[in-house]
Design a protein with these regions (language model features):
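Conserved "HGTGT" condensation-loop signature of ketosynthase/thiolase-family condensing enzymes
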Residues: 4-79, 97-101, 112-125
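Active-site-proximal alpha-helical scaffold in enzymes
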Residues: 83-113
Length: 125
């Protein structure tokens, strides 16, 4: 599938983003809810309209369960994606391909990290 085919089959209907910075008061789940509900509002949909989701997060040994719990997305497939610095892009790409293939109409691609809470400041170079 070339990029022009993808452009004709997939549309971004909403987006949400949390404030970047030190968010000591918010958990990763809080950030997921904040971004997702902003995206739902922007798209004019509700969480129940989402048919599948992709969660991008690095270093978490859990599956898509945190996203399902935080957003009450019961009984839909949620795939956790991890691809180092390209994790969010990979989650987005997989969600786009699922829509382009005609498997789903409305999907959610979401990525979250809370590096400061884990006391990890990055890799030394």
């Amino acid at each position: 599938m070339c990029s022009s085919d993808l452009r004709d089959r997939v549309a971004i209907i909403g987006m949400g983003c949390t404030k970047f910075g030190e968010r000591w008061d918010a958990s990763a789940s809080d950030l997921m809810v904040e971004a997702a509900y902003e995206a739902f509002s922007d798209a004019g949909i509700e969480g129940k309209d989402v048919q599948a989701a992709w969660l991008g997060t690095v270093g978490s040994f859990r599956t898509g369960q945190p996203l399902a719990e935080a957003l009450k997305l019961d009984y839909i497939p949620i795939s956790r994606v991890e691809n180092a610095c390209a994790t969010a892009t990979d989650a987005f790409r997989n969600a786009c391909y699922a829509v382009a293939a005609g498997i789903y109409d409305i999907v959610l691609a979401l990525a979250v990290e809370k590096l400061k809470d884990s006391r990890f400041s990055g890799f030394a170079i």
